[in-house]
Regions:
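Non-catalytic signal-transmission and effector/linker regions of two-component phosphorelay proteins
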Residues: 1-9, 93, 107-119
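Two-component/phosphorelay signaling modules centered on CheY-like receiver
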Residues: 17-36
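Active-site residues of response regulator receiver
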Residues: 59
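Acidic catalytic/metal-coordinating carboxylates
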Residues: 66-69
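Hydrophobic/aromatic residues positioned on beta-strands within the core alpha/beta folds
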Residues: 84-85
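A Lys-centered signature of the CheY-like receiver
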Residues: 104
Length: 119
């Protein structure tokens, strides 16, 4: 599955560095560029406000803090995003109930399908 013409550069927000590196590798293998990576809420919010990227992959739980404020900022900027979570539907936000979610662990094919849904 090829990358979308509109979505080329990704922001990855993930607090577990090994998982972040795995997601970065998957995105690279799928033909995307990782334009930014954040492991903490404050860092991710700065990137969400000022970063230059086309879409984002957000872990929901960042060391006990929820990533919904990041999603709010991305929505405000009109940047598509998807949530990646190992918690299934246990952690929810009414404001983002319709957001695309991918269940961890996932493989490249599943990530590609999720990205296609936000394109």
């Amino acid at each position: 599955m090829g990358r979308s013409a509109e979505l080329r550069r990704a922001l990855v927000v993930e607090d577990e560095i090994m998982v972040a590196m795995y997601v970065e590798d998957l995105l690279t293998d799928l033909g995307y560029e990782v334009a930014g990576m954040a492991t903490a809420l404050d860092e991710a919010l700065c990137l969400a406000r000022d970063g230059e990227f086309d879409f984002a992959v957000l872990d929901i739980n960042l060391a006990g803090q929820l990533s919904f404020p990041i999603a709010d900022e991305l929505r405000r900027r009109g940047i598509p995003f998807l949530f990646a979570s190992g918690y299934g539907s246990k952690v929810r936000s009414d404001a983002h109930a319709e957001a695309v979610r991918i269940q961890k662990p996932f493989i490249g094919r599943e990530l590609a399908r999720a990205i296609a849904r936000i394109a």
